């Protein structure tokens, strides 16, 4: 992902933790913070050393980044997302990670509504 789509600084992470809203499932915790002045979304990833060695942690981060790359058009812009991976993610494959991330993002309101338009007229 391009640098402008990343959250890297500790102060930015802390702001999302303090002012953001958290949503979780068994595999991920997602903090979201509205940034209306920002025309794009940004993501920050947190994978604890408890999940495994560096190889496993980096693989999890690659999976999550790839999910966001594929869902780029569906993710609501103008928000910061901090994704924290939990223990079960270490044993999951890419398809399972994507399904779980979709679930928690939908729950957090981080995905655009699908093409369900209802005409009231």
From Swiss-Prot:
This protein's GO CC annotations: ribonuclease P complex
Superkingdom to which the source organism belongs: Bacteria
Keyword Nuclease carried by entry: yes
UniProt catalytic activity: Endonucleolytic cleavage of RNA, removing 5'-extranucleotides from tRNA precursor
Entry keywords, A to Z: Endonuclease, Hydrolase, Nuclease, RNA-binding, tRNA processing
Biological processes annotated in GO: tRNA 5'-leader removal
EC numbers for this chain: 3.1.26.5
GO terms for MF: 3'-tRNA processing endoribonuclease activity; ribonuclease P activity; tRNA binding
First-tier enzyme category under EC: hydrolase
Similarity-based family: Belongs to the RnpA family.
Subunit relationships: Consists of a catalytic RNA component (M1 or rnpB) and a protein subunit.
PANTHER family: RIBONUCLEASE P PROTEIN COMPONENT
Function: RNaseP catalyzes the removal of the 5'-leader sequence from pre-tRNA to produce the mature 5'-terminus. It can also cleave other RNA substrates such as 4.5S RNA. The protein component plays an auxiliary but essential role in vivo by binding to the 5'-leader sequence and broadening the substrate specificity of the ribozyme.
Name by which UniProt lists this protein: Ribonuclease P protein component
Gene that encodes it: rnpA
